[in-house]
């Protein structure tokens, strides 16, 4: 195993585009209110793992998937993660982590984030894509630090909605 630093170094050195498939999380979160069941994801997961071994990662957990599995689907989100890990052993599994909010809708104590990240890493998450809706890095810091105590990778993301190429853009620019 390369470890997080070795993984990041290898990624920076490669020339091929690294593709992340977000359909296991974002596609049905955005289009179907996250109502795709685990059994349906498991029907395609081994096929994808076999046909697309070069895929950089599969974002399959986090965001609303945790909450919806419990409240609306009557499923165990941890069982979903474990089964996807078994079905795609050759893929980097990725999750979306809401910084201090973890997978909830309100900030949690640091100890909760630490325990959640440790369990998610142990269950199969290789890459944690960490963000904060207000781009507050201080709100992302507990999650980043928690991931750094595991052998998983912390992929920190900033969110924006604007046109970087618009000459009138004053907030987000390429300068």
Predicted regions and their residues:
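Flexible inter-domain linker/hinge segments
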Residues: 1-13
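Transmembrane beta-strand segments of Gram-negative outer membrane beta-barrel proteins
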Residues: 14-21
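Conserved, mostly hydrophobic/aromatic
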Residues: 19, 27, 130
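Conserved phosphate/anionic-ligand binding catalytic regions in large, soluble enzymes, centered on
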Residues: 22-33
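N-terminal phosphate-binding or glycine-rich loops at protein starts, especially the Walker A/P-loop
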Residues: 32-40
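Catalytic domains of carbohydrate-active enzymes, especially glycoside hydrolases
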Residues: 40-64, 118-127
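Active-site beta->alpha loop and helix N-cap motifs at the rims of alpha/beta catalytic domains
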Residues: 62-175
């Amino acid at each position: 195993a390369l470890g997080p630093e070795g993984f990041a170094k290898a990624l920076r050195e490669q020339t091929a585009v690294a593709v992340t498939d977000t359909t296991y999380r974002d596609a049905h979160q955005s289009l179907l209110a996250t109502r795709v069941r685990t059994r349906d994801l498991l029907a395609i997961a081994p096929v994808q793992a076999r046909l697309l071994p070069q895929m950089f990662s599969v974002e399959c957990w986090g965001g609303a998937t945790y909450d919806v599995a419990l409240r609306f689907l009557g499923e165990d989100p941890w069982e979903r993660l474990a089964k996807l890990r078994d079905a795609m052993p050759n893929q980097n599994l990725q999750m979306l982590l809401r910084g201090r909010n973890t997978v909830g809708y309100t900030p949690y104590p640091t100890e909760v984030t630490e325990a959640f990240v440790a369990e998610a890493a142990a269950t199969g998450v290789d890459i944690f894509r960490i963000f904060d809706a207000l781009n507050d890095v201080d709100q992302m810091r507990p999650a980043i630090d928690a991931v750094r105590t595991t052998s998983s990778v912390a992929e920190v993301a900033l969110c924006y909605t604007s046109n970087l190429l618009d000459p009138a853009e004053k907030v987000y620019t390429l300068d």
